[in-house]
Design a protein with these regions (language model features):
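Alpha-helical transmembrane segments and their immediate juxtamembrane cytosolic regions
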Residues: 2-390
């Protein structure tokens, strides 16, 4: 461990903004933790089906406010991509090579999970596992991948949207919701918000990369204004309080992204930007920075395999136990289930560690050694001074 810490510290450029990497790691871990807490696999009537404690326990809604951290991921993504594209242009790197490299790093680990689960689904069907069970498990793994497609599209559009003010996509989200929800317009209009909704934090990140929002006043305005707007939309405009989809719910704030989700995302981004200073101070410690660097190096591996880790623990326990286990196979309809689920989280994490050990090479490609880690090598030299001022 000491050797790893030393290698990561030695390989990190002096001007790298470590706090940005920490925000990305926190965003990924927030999504993972949220999925593990609000996703249940119920074993009954000879099948396994998905369920959510949010449908039975509305008092758990604040969990979605803490763990729905995708806006922070898009904030960081926009900041890093805009800075990377600016650096590429200065060095004369053509757009095709730049975007090809970034998309390859994004999708390289996706191929592994798709192949493994295609084979697993085929084997389960041949072995006699019911189609509803196979469909429920596959959906659990594949449905979170939607955000990668959106992120890839925004990455490809970075040269066009890098200077777009985040208010413009926010206005689009506002008008789409006004028409589809307020005026009874076609539901299909919501597809516009799939792009526009996530453009808001992405463009905000690009604004930060250009040197915007340096002062704390603007960041506090995002946090407080976004919070007040989201609360008002929930209280008086009929938006759901949960920031994730709830089975059986009247509507979802994420599918497609709603105005309430966009407002809440702005609040999250404001909080994230306010945390940059404290995070930079903490990350001066080499051991803490090494953990953040390792998580970033395998961020997509962690995201892609976290649901599989939960599934394998659930399935293994179902085969070994004499009866359904609380917090794992039972209906998530009381506080006892939540307490039991908390004790299963370390087991899920251990299983995920195993998948990380096996599949991290898909994300890291042919790189070797601490000095070759993506988390260290992506630093753009021209951002060093800007990072210190932010």
């Amino acid at each position: 461990m000491t050797g790893l810490v030393a290698r990561v510290e030695a390989a990190t450029p002096p001007g790298r903004d470590r706090a940005v990497d920490a925000l990305r790691a926190l965003a990924i871990l927030g999504v993972v933790g949220g999925h593990w807490l609000v996703t249940a696999l119920v074993a009954d009537s000879g099948t396994v089906r998905g369920a959510s404690p949010l449908a039975q326990l509305p008092e758990l809604t604040p969990v979605s406010w803490v763990f729905q951290t995708l806006a922070v991921f898009f904030l960081v993504g926009g900041q890093v991509a805009a800075g990377s594209w600016a650096s590429a242009r200065k060095r004369g790197v053509p757009y095709g090579r730049w975007v090809g490299g970034r998309l390859a790093r994004l999708f390289r680990p996706v191929a592994a999970v798709l192949v493994v689960w295609a084979l697993a689904a085929a084997v389960m069907l041949v072995a006699g596992v019911g189609e509803p069970t196979v469909r429920a498990l596959a959906k659990l793994v594949w449905s979170p991948l939607w955000f990668l497609l959106v992120f890839a599209a925004l990455t490809a559009l970075t040269p066009l949207v890098a200077r777009l003010h985040p208010l413009w996509p926010l206005v689009v989200v506002l008008h789409v919701d006004l028409v589809r929800l307020g005026l009874g317009g076609p539901r299909e209009l919501g597809w516009i918000n799939v792009v526009a909704g996530w453009l808001v934090p992405y463009c905000l990140g690009a604004l930060v990369a250009r040197g915007g929002l340096r002062g704390r006043a603007g960041r506090w305005a995002l946090l407080l204004g976004g919070t007040v707007a989201a609360a008002a939309l929930v209280r008086w405009a009929g938006y759901p309080a949960s920031m994730v989809g709830v089975p059986g719910g009247r509507m979802s704030n994420l599918d497609p992204p709603s105005l309430a989700a966009a407002a809440f995302g702005l609040a999250q981004c404001g909080a994230a930007l306010l945390l940059l200073g404290p995070l930079r101070r903490v990350l001066r410690r080499p051991a803490v920075w090494a953990v953040v660097a390792v998580v970033n190096l395998s961020a997509m591996t962690v995201f892609l395999w976290h649901q599989t880790a939960m599934i394998i623990v659930t399935a293994s326990a179902l085969l070994l136990a004499d009866e359904p286990l609380p917090g794992l196979h039972t209906v998530p309809d009381d506080v006892g289930w939540v307490v039991a689920r908390l004790f299963w989280l370390p087991v899920f994490a251990l299983a995920l560690l195993g998948y990380w050990a096996v599949f991290r090479g898909c994300e890291q490609g042919g790189r070797r050694g601490g000095g070759g880690s993506l988390v260290v090598r992506e630093s753009a030299p021209e951002r060093r001074g800007r990072a210190r001022r932010a």
